[in-house]
Every structure is written in C-alpha cells, then in structure tokens.
C-alpha cells in the first residue's frame, strides 16, 4: 500500500483529520484539486490586496464553549495567531442596528431594547439557553460528533446534569420555531431569529432543528468570532504544516476521479491524470452527491443509498463580490462583519453579509483602502460559463450587490477601486460544491443530524467528514467532523485517540488589533522573518509567470514559507525536476512583480531552505 490513509478533499475538515492522523504516525496523503489547500477557507490576491475566498467568520477559537479549532491546534502543538473581534457582528435589521456582544446578558439587554414588548421573554430565553449550554457544552468539553459519541461518556455527562440533558435531547426532532414559540409571540422577532439561523446553518427557524439552534444562539456570544492574523492563508496553511512536518503528502492540483475497489471494499483513489494511489483506509471530505454520484461506481453501492443521497436538499447557491474601496467610505464604528437585511420578512437576495476584515487586519490592503467581501444568496438560474448570457447575468449581479452595499455605505460606488464576482459556477469550479451551494445539504428537519451522512459508512475503511455529515456546516463543526473521522480510524487501528484533557498547553495566541505588518512573524528569528516576508509577497498566481508547469511549484513553496512551513517547502523544492539554483534566476526575472522592479526574492528563499537541512 502507498498509504495508511488517503484523505479526499483538502478543506478544513479533511486537513484536520489528516493533520491529526499524521501526528499519530500514520502515512497520510491529502488530495485536493486546487493548488492551495483549504477549500472555502483560503486566499487569493489581486495586486497587493489579499482576499479571503470564503470562510472568514471563524468561531471555535475561544477559551471555552464549542472551541474545536483551539482544541485541534493545542492537540497538534501548532502555534497560530488569531484576532478576536470586539463583537460577533452587527445585524442591520430594518431600522435597527443590533450589535452581537460577546456577553449574553448584554446582548439580551440590547435585543430587549429592540423588541420591548418581548423584553422579559428575551431575558428568560437567553437565561434558559445559557444554563443548558453551560451544562451540556462548557462543563463537558466533547470534540466528537453525536454519531461517534461513546455510551460511557454520554451517560457520565447525562448524570451530571440530567434535566439540562433531557431538555437538550428533546430538541432533536423539533424545529427552532417550536422552541421559540415557547417564549415569543411578536412575529417580528421570529423574522429576526430567521435571519440568525439562515446565517448559522442556512435554514429558516421552521426548518432548522432546535437542538442546533439552541447551541448556536448562545455559543457565538460565549466563544466569540475570530480571524487569523495575516489572513485565512494561515489557518489551512498551519494544518498543512502539521501534515508535512509529520511526513504526510499533499497532492495538490489533482482531482480524485474515482474510489478504487478490491473485493468489494475501497482500496485507493484514481486521480484525474490516471494515476492510482492505494491505501488501507480512505477519508472523504466532500459532498454526499459527489461521493455517491461520481466517485463510487454504482456497482459498489446500493440503489436505495444512491437515491437517498440524490434526495438531499441543498442549501441555496451563493454569489460573492470581492471589492476594494477608499478607506473613507467605511465610517468609523463599522464592524468587520455586518449583516445587511434588506427584507426583514423573508429570505431573499437582498440579504447580504459584508466582511470588512481590513478593519481589524491592516495587512490585507494599503493604508488608504478597505477590502469588502459581500456574500449572499442567489435564486436565479445561472447559465453555463460558456454561454453568451453568462457575462450579462454576472454584470447584473455585480450591480445588484454594489447597490446593496451603497445603501449601507453611501459613496461605496464612487469609492470603488476594484471588484470581481464569484458566481455559483465559480464556487463549484473551485470547491466542487454542487451548484454553488456553499453549505452542502441543508441542515433541516428530515435530513438533519443522524439522517445525514455519518462518520462511518457501509464500508469499514471509508470514513466521512465535512458539511454533508451529521453536524453540518460551519468551521468549528466541520473541524469537529474531521476530528471524529480521525478518531474513528485511530480506534479501528488500535491507536491513541484525541480526547480533551484539562490543562492542555495553549498554542493559540490572541494578538492586538488593528493587526499590522510590523506584527507579522514577531516570534520568528530575523532570518526567518526576512524570507517569510519575501514569500508572503508572492501573488500566488493561478497561472504563474515564474514557473509555468505544476512540477516547478514555486508558488507552492512560497505559500508554505509564508506560514512557516519550512519542512514542507523544502520537501517541495526537492521534488522539483531540477532542484538546482541555476534555473531560479530565470524564475525570479519572470516574476510578475518584476514589472515594478521588485520580484519576489525566490533565490533568497531557496537558499534559506537549503541551509536549514530540515
């Protein structure tokens, strides 16, 4: 066998599983179709501006609560710097601007001021949910999915707070709406909570299971919202670093075309270039539709199972506007994340979330500008990219989103310096999320929790994680799913699993904001800082001018060095077909930044890697 385990899909869940398994000594490989890992969590650059491709509102790094990200980095013993936002976000709901404070009583007071007729009920609701959350989530940290929770720890936790657990479990097959009706009567407050569940799990309160909503309504006020210092390049980059430092392989720019079978069991993966890799075990971190509709030959799956997968209802497709505006367009007091609710009565295309993360992280763009990324639903039928209608529809969507942002930020259109749109076609092309449904199957009653794809499949050596599985969408949830998949495989192999231990060393450092370039790499040596800053200048071009083939992966080396993954960068350098310094001068002179007279110092970076001897 080539590997102990192959992970199909390099999003956060797949990277989490792979990094934890590599640390336990398993020979691990990750396959991803993109040149950078991370799936929806990562970056691209336009000029000197860094954009987050998607997931950038990150929960799960707090000191308590559902803090799966923090646990994983502590388990990996991998340092990461994070910025904690002052509040979760601000919701612009009709004429109300509601700040989501990182303090439940303070937020309840704020909400009561917006809905005075429901003030007593609001405080009672948040008191009840907070107590249950404390008993179920905070006092019994458990980083595993419900389908993988063992009987013994479940009973132990239940006996500690039986009433809270009984209440929590009673919400399993009830809607969030039924829970809210125990407390509220005002239709407007139901519309408000509709917006919260549509943001958290892409479902309305009538659709969303109460067991998830009850946690979400509290968790984000307790744990808070975070952003990786220096951009989301660092989150998947640090997980990749852990994989490669422990001997794992990253097979990037290659798509898994099929799961191979021997004697009726998965035995490996065929890549889109025809190469085949063998492994004792597989972990799949992708959509349920691609698994049963594309990767697994119908000969090896049941017709009923394929039909079940096909019936899974997707979340709505999304569009994303990436833009740069004059700094003065964004007024003082604006939050890094602002929800813009155009229609409080219904979920429609006027509902947009604006991410202005350059407010807290000034490394993303120049001093006189801001990055603004706007994400929202689209309900139109999108033509094929090859269609003549596609550019027209794309232009219409750009105009629509710019108009939404202009209402919240007068002068936005005039101050616009750059904009680019990702359509559902774009999203599917880069992430393989079917139809551009960014959150996979909708987490709604009837296909929620245990009625979704489980960690364990009908084959004892194929495990699953990601948005299609039990816990659904969200960065801390998919991270937990990756952790559960890793533990399921470790149990099978008789190896030590990952379990929370009190007193674990903390590897997550919170940094001051606004975060600046001077703060980058401040814990690294001067020599490391110099090459990391050079590497970070790389534009990560989709079609690099410096090295024109995938075998000469200068872009991949620079990306790794920028996050401190020197072992992975040196390994990639040694894998190049020449691996000598003579060719690097030509690469450096062809660097796109050379047009301004300052190409990335590729030779300097490689000399550093050569001198490390790692």
State the predicted function of each range.
Residues 227, 255-366, 456:
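Mid-domain catalytic core of redox enzymes
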Residues 186, 190-203, 218, 411-471:
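A glycine-rich dinucleotide-binding beta-alpha-beta segment and adjacent secondary-structure elements
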Residues 94-207:
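Rossmann-like flavin
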Residues 1-141, 442-443:
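N-terminal glycine-rich phosphate/pyrophosphate-binding loop and immediately adjacent elements
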Residues 216-266:
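Helical element adjacent to the flavin cofactor pocket in flavoenzyme catalytic cores
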Residues 326-425:
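C-terminal segments that line or cap access tunnels to active or ligand-binding sites in enzymes
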Residues 154-167, 204-238:
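Helix-loop-beta segment of a Rossmann-like dinucleotide-binding subdomain
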Residues 498-613:
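Ferredoxin-type iron-sulfur electron-transfer modules and their immediate structural context
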């Amino acid at each position: 066998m080539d590997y102990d385990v192959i992970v199909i899909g390099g999003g956060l869940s797949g990277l989490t599983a792979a990094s934890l398994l590599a640390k336990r000594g398993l020979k691990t490989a990750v396959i991803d179709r993109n040149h950078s890992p991370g799936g929806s969590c990562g970056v691209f650059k336009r000029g000197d501006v860094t954009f987050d491709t998607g997931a950038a509102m990150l929960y799960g790094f707090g000191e308590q609560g559902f803090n799966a990200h923090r646990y994983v980095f502590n388990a990996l013993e991998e340092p990461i710097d994070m910025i904690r936002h002052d509040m979760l976000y601000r919701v612009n709901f009709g004429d109300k601007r509601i700040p989501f404070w990182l303090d439940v009583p303070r937020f309840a007071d704020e909400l009561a001021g917006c809905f005075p007729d429901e003030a007593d009920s609001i405080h009672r609701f948040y008191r009840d949910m907070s107590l249950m959350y404390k008993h179920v989530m905070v006092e019994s940290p458990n980083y595993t999915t419900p389908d993988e929770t063992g009987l013994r720890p479940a009973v132990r936790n239940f006996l500690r707070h039986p009433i809270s657990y009984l209440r929590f479990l009673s919400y399993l097959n009830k809607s969030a709406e039924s829970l809210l009706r125990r407390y509220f009567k005002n239709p407007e407050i139901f519309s408000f909570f509709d917006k919260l569940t549509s943001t958290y799990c892409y479902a309305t309160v009538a659709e969303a299971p109460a067991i998830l909503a009850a946690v979400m309504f509290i968790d984000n006020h307790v744990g808070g919202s975070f952003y990786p210092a220096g951009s989301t390049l660092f989150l998947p980059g640090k997980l990749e670093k852990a994989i490669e430092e422990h001997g794992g392989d990253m097979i990037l720019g290659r798509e898994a075309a099929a799961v191979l079978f021997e004697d009726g069991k998965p035995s490996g993966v065929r890549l889109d270039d025809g190469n085949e890799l063998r492994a004792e075990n597989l972990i799949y971190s992708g959509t349920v539709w691609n698994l049963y509709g594309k990767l697994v030959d119908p000969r090896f799956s049941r017709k009923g199972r394929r039909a079940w997968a096909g019936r899974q209802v997707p979340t709505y497709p999304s569009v994303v506007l990436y833009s740069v505006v004059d700094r003065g367009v964004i007024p003082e007091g604006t939050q890094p994340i602002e929800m813009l609710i155009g229609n409080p009565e219904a979920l429609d295309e006027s509902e947009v979330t604006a991410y202005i993360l350059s407010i807290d992280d000034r490394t993303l763009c120049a001093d006189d500008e801001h990055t603004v990324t706007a994400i929202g639903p689209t309900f139109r039928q999108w033509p094929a990219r090859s269609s003549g209608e596609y550019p027209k529809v794309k232009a219409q969507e750009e105009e629509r989103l710019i108009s939404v942002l202009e209402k919240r930020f007068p002068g936005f259109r005039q101050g616009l310096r750059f904009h680019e749109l990702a359509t559902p076609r774009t999203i599917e092309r880069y992430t393989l999320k079917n139809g551009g449904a960014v959150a996979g199957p909708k987490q709604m009653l009837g296909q929620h929790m245990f009625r979704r794809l489980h960690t364990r499949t009908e084959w004892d050596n194929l495990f699953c994680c990601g948005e299609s599985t039990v816990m659904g969408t969200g960065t801390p949830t998919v991270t937990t799913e990756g952790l559960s998949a890793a533990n399921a495989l470790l149990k099978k192999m008789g190896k030590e699993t990952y379990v929370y231990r009190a007193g674990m060393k903390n590897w997550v450092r919170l940094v001051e904001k606004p975060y600046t370039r001077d703060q980058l790499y401040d814990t690294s040596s001067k020599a490391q800082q110099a090459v990391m800053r050079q590497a970070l200048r790389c534009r990560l071009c989709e079609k690099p001018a410096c090295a024109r083939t995938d075998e000469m992966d200068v872009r991949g080396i620079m990306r790794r060095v920028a996050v401190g993954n020197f072992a992975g960068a040196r390994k990639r350098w040694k894998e190049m077909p020449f691996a000598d310094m003579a060719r690097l001068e030509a690469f450096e002179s062809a660097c796109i930044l050379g047009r301004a007279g300052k190409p990335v110092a590729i030779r300097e970076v490689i000399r550093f890697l050569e001198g490390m001897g790692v």
